[in-house]
Amino acid sequence: MSVIMALDVTAGNPKGLEQFASQNKDTMQAVLEAAKRHGLIAHRFYASDDGSRVMVLDEWPDRQSFESFFREQESQIRPIFEAGGVTSEPQPRFWDELQTDDKFGWGA
């Protein structure tokens, strides 16, 4: 069963992250392709409504797949976070799906 990886960081400039992404499409695509090689299932960036935080929300086959990807790509990922004004060290959290018989969406 896959896991959700949530990376929630303090960010002073989420729009800066968007700007970096639009100006560095090759870098963003290279990181995405590396993630896919490691098994990435789904990926999104989100900003909090007050603009103070950025969250990366991914689905991976397992925790080890993400950790292997992140070790390999950390030097490419760091400038993306820096562009967003990230001021805290990324601390990923991993979430396992609970069996609750009320699944909806995401291909349930």
Where are these regions (language model features)?
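Short S/T/G/P-rich N-terminal loop/turn motif that feeds into the first structured element of a domain
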Residues: 1-75, 83-108
